[in-house]
Amino acid sequence: IGDCVMDFRKYSLKELVNNVKTKKVSAKEMTEAAINNISKYDKTLNAFCAVNFDDALKQAEHVDSLINKGEDPGMLAGLPIGVKDLEDAKGFVTSYGSELHINDEPAQEDSILVKRMKNQGCIVLGKTNTPEFGYKGKTDNVPFGTTKNPWNLDYSPGGSSGGTAAAIASGMIPMGTASDGGGSIRIPAALSGLAGIKTSQGRIPIESNKPPGSGVLTVKGLLANSTEDNAMALDEIGR
């Protein structure tokens, strides 16, 4: 891994994807930058509760190979993301921020949301922290500890999608998954200076055996730096 560090807050998703598709920067280079960001900043912020950088680099190399062969890498090609730890991502334990689940077997397949994001070229770096079962507006738990707000380390980034929010607001990654029943996207967006929307029911399907929180009240969605970024991604994964 090189020593480049990219502040993803300075670029729109459209700019990042265009740079990858036009080979101004490779998906692997962008993933390396995100890895360096996490290695540099996450010891302080505690936004991620699990990472797999080797697999992320393999995903990025696959995106680059599609581009080099003239094939479609997806509308979100090369974007490094975090997955909220209420959501299945293949190879990672879905712990729900709970001691009850930290020793569960790793997920054997991606959730519908994660699968759609990967199909559009996103690179999964790891799982982002959440309060136990996503049931409060502050992100802390017993297994992984407290996530801090990058704008002021004495404050919370909110919850329950606080790990994703802290990772984006610090510039470590440009986008990540989230979910919202009683404010779990909207609260972190407000407290961390991001764009978040509680999507309509069914916009992004929820697996019947894997509700991400408050049952029928909860929907899946994203956090990003701008409304434009959020709209661009939702247009692709919420069809």
Per-region residue spans from a language model:
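Conserved hydrophobic residue
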Residues: 25-26, 72, 173
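Short glycine/serine-rich loop segments
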Residues: 109-234
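Immediate post-signal peptide segment of exported/extracytoplasmic ligand-binding proteins
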Residues: 63-80, 229
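Conserved hydrophobic/aromatic pocket- or pore-lining residues that grip, position, or stack substrates
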Residues: 34, 56, 78, 84, ...
